[in-house]
Amino acid sequence: MKKILCFGDSNTYGFIPQSGLRYDKNTRWTGILQSLCRNELEVVEAGCNNRTAFIDNPAGIEQTGYKILPKYLKAEYFNIIILAIGVNDLQLFFKPTLKEFEQGIEKLIKITKDLSPNAKIILVCPSKLDLAGIKSGVFSFQFDEISVEKSYHLPQIYKKLAEKHACKLVDLNEIAKVSPLDGLHFSAESHKTIAENLYKNLKQTI
């Protein structure tokens, strides 16, 4: 059976807006995706709260994308790798420039291609942050107006990198908005929409 690695942050993990709990397997997009794939594909969930893509996270290796990704890629063979990560690098503590952000996401793509040269990559662009939700929610200490402004530039960056490295691009801005409850995470309805869209792209990729 072919395997898919879903590598990402809290929105891959299934973080429920504001509450901090986790959506169950039938609600988070990775679980729904497995249901849609049935016995055709095995979905491996690798989402982690607060995980950055390319910035060294003070929380540790598990939360630092480029350091922990090789662990998954060396452990088993994946036919398809979904990279759904990047928004945590915009936290106000880190302040990457847009150029540094582009170089960082490209670093993650190169690691993936080096360790899994035959795998197909689906690059997922995060949805733009919601400023009102950020300001009124529990993540106001991690993100600010500059974080939100930079998130509006991500679609161009991900599109450029997807074209450069022959990755399939899925731009979440076209299918799902973040919840106004915290300005960062997705509602259950959005998780369903994301799973259905990714499944369509998987069928085109296989």
Describe each region flagged by the PLM:
Residues Q63-I206:
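Alpha-helical cap/lid subdomain in secreted, periplasmic
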Residues M1-A59, K71-A75, K164, K192-T193:
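Serine-esterase "nucleophile elbow" of acetyl-processing enzymes
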